[in-house]
């Protein structure tokens, strides 16, 4: 495989990431998060055990009513960076044009992260309560994808 073949594969991967992060594939993305959680907990599952639900919950699985939300670095939006990365890869003529240095992530304490998460959960709880939803019926999953910060455990 030469550089141009690899560059083409990188571009295809960015196209796939953009498609996966699109609104059209929201449920598929939320189901993927649930599957990653179940794998991490070593809980076996079959694809046919997942079903879309009304909003909320996002995903039904057995007796669980999963409500999924994403936790990103401040200022990051779910698909923006992949949209930009796709343009970067499409306009590159060589792999060397794709090389860039990333800033070293800042270490944050778990308590700091949990406080941030709690603030988001309070807002969500308020919104769900206003809509007449029973919070005890939801199984919340927070999927954290941090680039600028890393947990100091």
Model regions: which residues?
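Metal-dependent nuclease catalytic core centered on acidic motifs
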Residues: 1-52, 69-153
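Conserved catalytic cores of phosphodiester-cleaving nucleases, focusing on short active-site segments
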Residues: 59, 64-70
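Beta-rich nucleic-acid/ligand-interaction surfaces
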Residues: 52-60
